[in-house]
Structure formats: C-alpha cells, structure tokens
C-alpha cells in the first residue's frame, strides 16, 4: 500500500494532481481543503495517501494532514459512503467542522454538503460518533499548537518518524513558531523520548 508520496507537483486540476516521484507520475485525487494549500507547480509536495484498489482501478487519494486522512478512512467505513462521497465531505467542510457537527449531532449542517441527504447525514452522525479520535475531538474546540504544524509534521515524516511520533512532538511547539524553529523543537522533544 502507498501511504505517502513526496515529489514534484507537475499539474493540479481540481480535484486531481499529478506528482512526479523519481520519474514516475502519480495521479492523486485530493479534497479541496488540501488543494487550496498546495504549493505551485514545479515545487516539492508531500502528501499522505490512501490507496484504494478496485477491480477496474487503482486509485490514490492525498491529504496534507494526518487528521484529514484519518477522517477519510473513517468515512469509508460507513455503509453507502464511497471514496468520492468522502472526498466531497472533506471538500465541503474541514475536519474540525465535521468533528464539531458530529459532537453537536448537527444533521442540518451535513445536509448542506452536495450529495448528502437527511438519511445519509443521520447515518454519518450515528456512525462517526466517538470514532473521530481524541486528536480530532481536540481540534474541534482548539486551534493547532503551531501555525506551521503541517510543514513541521511533513519534515518529521521525511526524516523517518511515524505520524504518531510527529503529532506528539508537535504538541511541544508553541503557536507562532516558524517552521525551522518548530522542527528543531520537535526534534528536541523526540530526542528525549
């Protein structure tokens, strides 16, 4: 399974990307939340991915944050929600907004998303309740510890640390810290473990 892609962004045409990794071009679909935060064509990009193998296709879905990928995976577990619908949910609202809607059992908020009717919204609320995880629940009520958390996490992943280690280390980085200083603080926290 392909869990992460790092390479040069060649093309972006919502919601599709083409990323060159050592001469191989990977087509990746991303939610709009990820799409709007991508670098320019020709720049390096790191995406966490979810590979879906079907009888007629081998598909890759990409995300800038571990929370988006985790939420995508949880959405796929729900009956009647496929990859396209899960991508539409993450394109229509942030992970924090989804976690908040689930916590508040706000079906009306979910029905505003394209392709989500009342029954589907109620199923989402029922099946996601308590499954978004502690990290996502914390995100629903609070801002991330650092404004550059995604960049810092991607750097830690590139250095070979796991997502879990990276997320734990980022909690030690104060808000407003720059990327390079944040990486240093995160590495310092990881060296103490």
Swiss-Prot record:
Domain of life: Bacteria
Any one GO molecular-function label of the UniProt entry: ATP binding
Domain I: annotated span: 1-64
GO BP of this protein: DNA recombination; DNA repair
Subcellular location: Cytoplasm
Pfam family of the protein (one): HHH_5
Keyword match Cytoplasm: yes
Domain III, as annotated region: 144-193
Keyword Endoplasmic reticulum: no
Keywords: Cytoplasm, DNA damage, DNA recombination, DNA repair, DNA-binding
InterPro entries, A to Z: DNA_helicase_Holl-junc_RuvA_I, Hlx-hairpin-Hlx_DNA-bd_motif, NA-bd_OB-fold, RuvA, RuvA_2-like, RuvA_C, RuvA_C_sf
GO cellular component: cytoplasm; Holliday junction helicase complex; Holliday junction resolvase complex
Main location: cytoplasm
Region: Domain II, residue numbers: 65-139
Gene3D superfamilies the record matches: 5' to 3' exonuclease, C-terminal subdomain, DNA helicase RuvA subunit, C-terminal domain, Nucleic acid-binding proteins
Subunit structure, as described in the record: Homotetramer. Forms an RuvA(8)-RuvB(12)-Holliday junction (HJ) complex. HJ DNA is sandwiched between 2 RuvA tetramers; dsDNA enters through RuvA and exits via RuvB. An RuvB hexamer assembles on each DNA strand where it exits the tetramer. Each RuvB hexamer is contacted by two RuvA subunits (via domain III) on 2 adjacent RuvB subunits; this complex drives branch migration. In the full resolvosome a probable DNA-RuvA(4)-RuvB(12)-RuvC(2) complex forms which resolves the HJ.
Entry text on domains: Has three domains with a flexible linker between the domains II and III and assumes an 'L' shape. Domain III is highly mobile and contacts RuvB.
Function: The RuvA-RuvB-RuvC complex processes Holliday junction (HJ) DNA during genetic recombination and DNA repair, while the RuvA-RuvB complex plays an important role in the rescue of blocked DNA replication forks via replication fork reversal (RFR). RuvA specifically binds to HJ cruciform DNA, conferring on it an open structure. The RuvB hexamer acts as an ATP-dependent pump, pulling dsDNA into and through the RuvAB complex. HJ branch migration allows RuvC to scan DNA until it finds its consensus sequence, where it cleaves and resolves the cruciform DNA.
Name of the protein described by the UniProt record: Holliday junction branch migration complex subunit RuvA
Species per Swiss-Prot/TrEMBL record: Burkholderia lata (strain ATCC 17760 / DSM 23089 / LMG 22485 / NCIMB 9086 / R18194 / 383)
Lineage: Bacteria, Pseudomonadati, Pseudomonadota, Betaproteobacteria, Burkholderiales
Gene responsible for this protein: ruvA
């Amino acid at each position: 399974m392909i869990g992460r892609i790092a390479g040069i962004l060649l093309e972006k045409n919502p919601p599709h990307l083409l990323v060159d990794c050592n001469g191989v071009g990977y087509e990746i679909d991303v939610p709009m939340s990820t799409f709007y935060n991508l670098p320019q064509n020709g720049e390096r990009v790191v995406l966490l991915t979810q590979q879906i193998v079907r009888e007629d296709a081998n598909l890759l879905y990409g995300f800038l944050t571990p929370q988006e990928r985790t939420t995508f995976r949880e959405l796929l577990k729900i009956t009647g929600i496929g990859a396209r619908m899960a991508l539409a949910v993450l394109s229509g609202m942030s992970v924090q907004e989804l976690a908040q809607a689930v916590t508040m059992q706000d079906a009306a908020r979910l029905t505003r998303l394209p392709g989500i009717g009342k029954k589907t919204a109620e199923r989402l609320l029922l099946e996601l309740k308590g499954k978004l995880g502690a990290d996502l629940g914390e995100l629903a009520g609070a801002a991330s510890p650092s404004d550059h958390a995604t960049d810092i996490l991607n750097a830690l992943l590139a250095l070979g640390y796991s997502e879990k280690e990276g997320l734990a280390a980022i909690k030690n980085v104060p808000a407003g810290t720059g990327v390079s200083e944040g990486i240093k603080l995160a590495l310092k926290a990881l060296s103490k473990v």
